[in-house]
């Protein structure tokens, strides 16, 4: 189910957020060169929709991303992460860009820090999906299909 799309008509970059009903997780797919403002909008869209669709599992797919992923690491670490956890995030499968074996998230944000959810980094989307499925099987109490909240 499509929840949000941010699209830049100038360079065709985008961030699409969906709730994958069969898999029961939120998924963000980033494409192209995402500038800092676009990255912030995409991250904020996740928080907005996670409030309506609380979900413990998140697949963050950067495999089609070019360039740096996120420049505001301080905001990500001190605002996004705590809010996402408050909204129920417990497992994140993070797929790095195809031309890289690491990215800013794994090399800088988490350097020496404990994150309050389980984070695994993958080079292949299929491996990330498989890991999230295993996490769901190991944590069946967290695997309930979210519904719209009437806040």
Model-predicted segments: where are they?
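Amphipathic, Lys/Arg-enriched alpha-helical "gate/interface" segment within cytosolic domains
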Residues: 2-151
């Amino acid at each position: 189910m499509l929840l949000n799309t941010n699209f830049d008509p100038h360079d065709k970059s985008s961030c699409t957020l969906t709730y994958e009903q069969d898999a029961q997780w939120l998924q963000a797919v980033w494409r192209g060169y995402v500038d800092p403002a676009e990255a912030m909008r995409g991250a904020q869209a996740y928080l907005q929709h996670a409030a309506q669709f609380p979900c413990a599992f998140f697949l963050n797919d950067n495999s089609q991303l070019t360039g740096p992923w996120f420049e505001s690491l301080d905001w990500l670490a001190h605002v996004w992460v705590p809010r996402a956890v408050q909204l129920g995030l417990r497992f994140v499968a993070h797929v790095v860009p195809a031309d890289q074996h690491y990215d800013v998230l794994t090399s800088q944000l988490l350097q020496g820090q404990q994150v309050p959810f389980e984070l695994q980094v993958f080079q292949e989307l299929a491996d990330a999906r498989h890991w999230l499925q295993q996490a769901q099987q190991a944590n069946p109490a967290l695997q309930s299909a979210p519904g719209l909240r009437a806040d």
